[in-house]
Amino acid sequence: MALTKAEMAEHLFETLGINKRVAKEMVETFFEEIRSALESGEQVKLSGFGNFDLRDKNQRPGRNPKTGEDIPISARRVVTFRPGQKLKSRVESSNSEK
């Protein structure tokens, strides 16, 4: 099961008592700030959680799996996420409790 933006907004509504429309706007604004920063080439650091980084990948050779034809995979910029130590520790400890 995955946590959705709608579930995050619902949790804000239940926990903080703000109305659902405002909670949804808060969640959307949070993710839009991350998107905007990444689009403008900035790193996003969320203390205690992790970092979103941009990485440039060079062009490399590839192969069409259906035809076996060699094709170039173009250079591109990708987003990577590196979890912080606190997040890693909490995930590891919750996994060992199961």
Swiss-Prot record:
Alphabetic keyword roster: DNA recombination, DNA-binding, Transcription, Transcription regulation, Translation regulation
Chain's gene name: ihfA
GO annotations of cellular component type: cytosol
Keyword Transcription regulation attributed: yes
Similarity field: Belongs to the bacterial histone-like protein family.
Subunit details: Heterodimer of an alpha and a beta chain.
Superkingdom assignment: Bacteria
Protein name: Integration host factor subunit alpha
